[in-house]
């Protein structure tokens, strides 16, 4: 979906499980217009050997939104851990202007959403009504649901050009390291965005000021992962986000396995309760 920008994987407790599921699901869907190259070996095998020393680009901010001190400490601590494992970390800036990037992305999302809803209406025999949609979907359709074919094509070409820029950037780097979020994980309900009075630029501001890093790799097609290596003062995990070159998922998984061994996270549980035997019990 979204001209190739929407791809699914999983959230797992271990790198082993992530690699195993990728082994089970990897491969090109017949006739798909976009596909990553097939790996030479299984992803589970990639975990058996430490990665070669990697050139890691440390990116602390993208776009106009500041990164909080906690997020900066989380990513810098991850960088120090990588250096201790033999990798070389250097500061870098990504070749993207984020407001322009997001405008193109939402042009594609708006046109795609309009198309999906029209198809759904045809399948069920009645048009989809605005009241059946969430407010944020209505906001996107209001601003981007009637773009022209030329505007849609231009947005896709813009995203393709961005992918080429990122490929050039990756000639000098093996991996990009950034925060996953600009601040501590948001309280439940904060990102609800169910307010029809919001303009699209306000919706984008509210969400992408919180998470500006990850969408870039949906667009470039690069494999990426969030690894829990730091906990906030409130005991919440703050991810370090890593991205590799297009098709180099095995490099990321090997790095993740190395990080997991050096700084395990599976034993970390919520300070309030933990699920034991299907029931909730106090954590110890």
Q: What would you call each of these model-derived segments?
A:
Residues 45-60, 108-167, 179-184, 188-190, ...:
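Short helix-loop capping/hinge segments that flank enzyme active sites or metal/cofactor-binding pockets
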Residues 174-175:
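Short, Asp-centered acidic motifs that coordinate Mg2+ and/or phosphate
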Residues 167-168, 204-227:
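Small-aliphatic-rich amphipathic alpha-helix that forms the alpha element of a beta-alpha
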Residues 35, 103, 186-211:
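Short, surface-exposed loop/helix-turn segments at secondary-structure junctions
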Residues 88-95:
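General small-molecule cofactor/ligand-binding pocket signal
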Residues 10, 236-245, 252-253:
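Short, well-ordered beta-strand elements
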Residues 6-13, 143-145, 242-243:
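Short, well-ordered beta-strand elements within core beta-sheets of diverse protein domains
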Residues 1-78, 123, 263-284:
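A short helix-breaking turn/cap at a secondary-structure junction
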């Amino acid at each position: 979906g979204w001209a190739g920008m929407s791809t699914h994987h999983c959230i797992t407790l271990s790198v082993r499980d992530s690699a195993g599921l990728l082994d089970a699901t990897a491969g090109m869907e017949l006739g798909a217009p976009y596909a990553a190259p097939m790996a030479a070996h299984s992803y589970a095998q990639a975990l058996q050997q430490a990665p070669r020393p990697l050139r890691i680009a440390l990116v602390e901010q993208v776009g106009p939104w500041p990164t909080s001190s906690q997020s900066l400490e989380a990513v810098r601590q991850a960088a120090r851990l990588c250096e201790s494992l033999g990798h070389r970390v250097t500061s870098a800036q990504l070749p993207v202007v984020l407001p322009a990037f997001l405008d193109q992305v939402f042009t594609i999302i708006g046109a795609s959403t309009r198309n999906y809803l029209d198809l759904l209406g045809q399948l069920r025999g009645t048009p989809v009504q605005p009241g059946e949609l969430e407010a944020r979907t209505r906001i996107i359709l209001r601003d981007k649901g009637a773009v022209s074919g030329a505007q849609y094509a231009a947005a896709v070409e813009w995203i393709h050009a961005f992918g080429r820029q990122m490929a050039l950037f990756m000639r000098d780097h093996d991996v990009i390291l950034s925060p996953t979020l600009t601040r501590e994980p948001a309280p439940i309900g904060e990102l609800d965005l169910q307010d029809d009075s919001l303009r699209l630029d306000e919706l984008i501001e509210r969400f992408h000021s919180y998470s500006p890093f990850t969408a870039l790799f949906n667009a470039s097609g690069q494999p990426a992962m969030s690894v829990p290596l730091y906990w906030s003062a409130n005991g919440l995990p703050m991810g370090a986000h890593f991205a590799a070159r297009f098709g180099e998922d095995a490099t990321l998984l090997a790095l993740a396995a190395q990080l997991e061994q050096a700084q395990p996270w599976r034993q970390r549980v919520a300070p309030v309760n933990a699920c034991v035997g299907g029931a909730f019990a106090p954590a110890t």
